[in-house]
């Protein structure tokens, strides 16, 4: 009997697929089938897959013209014969050889329809929890009801009863982006509860994954967000709904705003999302709606005027510092560099937790600039949850010229979204 069918969509992953496959083949549970779906790769991916098929009897290859990973996974679901289904991205891997066996045994012991554990990111050779919301990390083993499940992300760290998925006809929407969270929420909604394990069951590679959102991808991204909000609200999945709303204003909102004026469907999606937000607000949850119509037009004009004032003002400053040396900090530095603004340094509260140099620029402690604080402007380039705290710290240290730059405004300044 095949215990687990592992579904792996593959598109131009020649650099990573071997590590992924070796991770799967090293698993201590032997009763598995590996379904590899080539999504019209143009590099050596298919050649590598065929080499594995030749030497491994449990490897099956499916092929399709380039249509996206969601459609590829749906092919895998239909072809699967295992008791459970697992999903893996072709550039990711399992943390240990007994990971799948541990998850499978736990699922059997508990009778779980959906069972899995925590996740860990892998970025530039470093294992880290940075960038993961709390729903990706569990503090103990146990059941979590659909109402309390805290996120719509991280579907790949779970296994799913195959007959459940197939009989309920739960498939990935045919979106180019954000197609997995709607699948995940639909599965949880139908299962009613999920068994979650404290241990890490999946390693997610992050360093090379970036999407430049052209209109088609942006619309699909917005559709996926809308679908998740509709599903979670319909099913009473309040924790997942609120988690998604908490990150809506940033990259997601900027992505929608940039295309709303030229795409009527994007306008409609924004309106549909706002209907969910207003419904959520009946529960006295303070979530700001997205801008739409004339308000959005005026906002976009104001943002461009603010961009001009900011750049002009920074050109006059003696010293420009960027607080934060992470993803946001690097994006802000690149934006300012393209516009002719010279950054003196990245600054942080504790240099021992950061590299000494990031992207060729020194990382220094903010305290090094206290004596020169009147000559410095500090741009706060962190995620929103930290900005107010950092602003207060800077105020207490005597810095007065402080500019918190939100993710949403940065993307609108740039006129593009890359996530």
Question: Across the structure, where does each feature detected by a protein language model lie?
Answer:
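Short aromatic/hydrophobic "clamp" motif used to bind/position activated sugar donors
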Residues: 85
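Short, well-formed alpha-helical segments that are part of the catalytic scaffolds
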Residues: 12-26
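Glycine-rich, basic loop-to-helix element that forms the pyrophosphate-binding segment
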Residues: 64-80, 90
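A conserved acidic beta->alpha catalytic loop
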Residues: 23, 38-47
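Donor-binding/catalytic cores of nucleotide-activated saccharide
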Residues: 69, 90-195, 204-218, 260
